[in-house]
């Protein structure tokens, strides 16, 4: 950087991304710098825009489901959960109790997947490589649970309107239970390595600070909001599935900085493990999808002897089901915050309009206020603490 005649560094405008290892996706930031200090950030989005909301209007309600796996591809089951809840509200459909338990189990496993990746990458952005190697080994085990249940490691399409695609295979719940028993040891190791580490604290404490009022004004949700000291969690405030009968705490921070966001996510991982233990202990037997054959397909073995089952199967996968005219909004406490789906139905087999509320969009818009006055080296840490994925931001 060249110096001006009076000895001060000239203001400079630089590009951060869209191809940058710390950008967490195809993000382009226009930085206005004064020396090493950030004076202004202009985020440019849309580089991963695929027109998801418009594409959904041309698909049946079942065909639209896989699009939600591809939004926040780090935590896919949370999004298909929100979509399924929204369609079920329009249909007036009740889901069997076992399906509700399994939905919560996989949504909490999804929370583990998301928060583990975030902690690992935030540490990597700060210069710590060891947690990444430890954590990715455990994430692979969770992804294997995904694969055994749905056949896919990422894009599962497992949670569907009316219940689940299928029941879990024998032995899977036992393996998840075993995982919840030994996993806290790894979490303790990561905790010991990072939480009181002086370099980690220097890189995160008082960096990217947000006040309670700013968080509310920007529309924050999830760990970003709770790190500011506001205990808002949809699983507690607007319970869905079986969260109203589960015992868990809502971790909150106090300073609203990068360090508090890290602490909140680590605490949420432990709470998710506690929720998993309760679900695995209490889960009942029974069906995992509604018995309304106009919504959920019959079992495969029924097709061999029942003409009626064959007709239902053919109609569901060729034409789909018609959803009563109306509109509905459903939101879930996704790992990144409040993920909402708003659907308008015109009484046909395809949505008239589908609007998606992604938490990362609200968080990214605050990056200018969060990073202003900080050094350039602090920017990757702030981006890491935001926990953004551009599949859901650009849609």
From Swiss-Prot:
Subunit annotation: NDH-1 is composed of 14 different subunits. Subunits NuoB, C, D, E, F, and G constitute the peripheral sector of the complex.
HAMAP family the record matches: NDH1_NuoD
Organism this protein belongs to: Anaplasma phagocytophilum (strain HZ)
Molecular function terms from GO: NAD binding; NADH:ubiquinone reductase (non-electrogenic) activity; quinone binding
Domain of life per record: Bacteria
Topology within the bilayer: Peripheral membrane protein
Record bears the keyword Translocase: yes
Top EC class for this record: translocase
GO CC, one annotated term: plasma membrane
Protein name, as recorded: NADH-quinone oxidoreductase subunit D
């Amino acid at each position: 950087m060249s110096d001006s005649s009076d000895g001060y560094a000239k203001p400079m405008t630089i590009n951060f991304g869209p191809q940058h290892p710390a950008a967490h996706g195809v993000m382009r930031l226009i930085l206005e710098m004064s020396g090493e200090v950030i004076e202004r950030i202009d985020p440019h989005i849309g580089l991963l825009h695929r027109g998801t909301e418009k594409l959904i209007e041309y698909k049946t309600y079942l065909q639209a489901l896989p699009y939600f796996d591809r939004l926040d591809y780090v935590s896919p089951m949370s999004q298909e959960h929100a979509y399924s809840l929204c369609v079920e509200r329009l249909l007036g459909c009740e889901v069997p109790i076992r399906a509700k338990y399994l939905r919560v189990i996989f949504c909490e496993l999804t929370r583990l997947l998301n928060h583990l990746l975030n902690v690992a990458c935030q540490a990597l952005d700060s210069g710590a490589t060891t947690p990444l190697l430890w954590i990715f080994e455990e994430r692979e085990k969770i992804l294997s649970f995904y694969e055994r249940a749905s056949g896919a490691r990422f894009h599962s399409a497992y949670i569907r309107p009316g219940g689940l695609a299928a029941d879990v295979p024998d032995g899977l719940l036992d393996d998840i239970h075993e995982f919840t028993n030994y996993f806290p040891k790894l979490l303790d190791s990561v905790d010991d390595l990072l939480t009181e580490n002086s370099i980690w604290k220097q890189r995160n404490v008082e960096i990217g600070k947000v006040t309670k009022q700013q968080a509310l004004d920007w529309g924050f949700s999830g760990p970003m909001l709770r790190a500011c000291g506001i205990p808002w969690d949809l699983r507690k405030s607007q319970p869905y599935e079986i969260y109203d009968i589960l015992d868990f705490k809502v971790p909150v921070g106090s300073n609203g900085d990068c360090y508090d966001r890290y602490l909140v996510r680590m605490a949420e991982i432990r709470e998710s493990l506690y929720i998993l233990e309760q679900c695995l202990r209490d889960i009942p037997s029974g069906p995992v999808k509604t018995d309304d054959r106009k919504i959920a397909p019959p079992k495969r073995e029924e097709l061999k002897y029942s003409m009626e089952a064959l007709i239902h199967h053919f109609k569901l996968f060729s034409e789909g089901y018609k959803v009563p005219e109306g509109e509905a909004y459903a939101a879930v406490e996704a790992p990144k915050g409040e993920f909402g789906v708003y659907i308008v139905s015109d009484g046909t087999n395809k949505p008239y309009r589908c609007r998606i509320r992604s938490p990362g969009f609200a968080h990214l818009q605050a990056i200018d206020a969060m990073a202003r006055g900080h050094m350039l080296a602090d920017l990757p840490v702030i981006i890491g603490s935001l926990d953004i994925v551009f599949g859901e931001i650009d849609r």
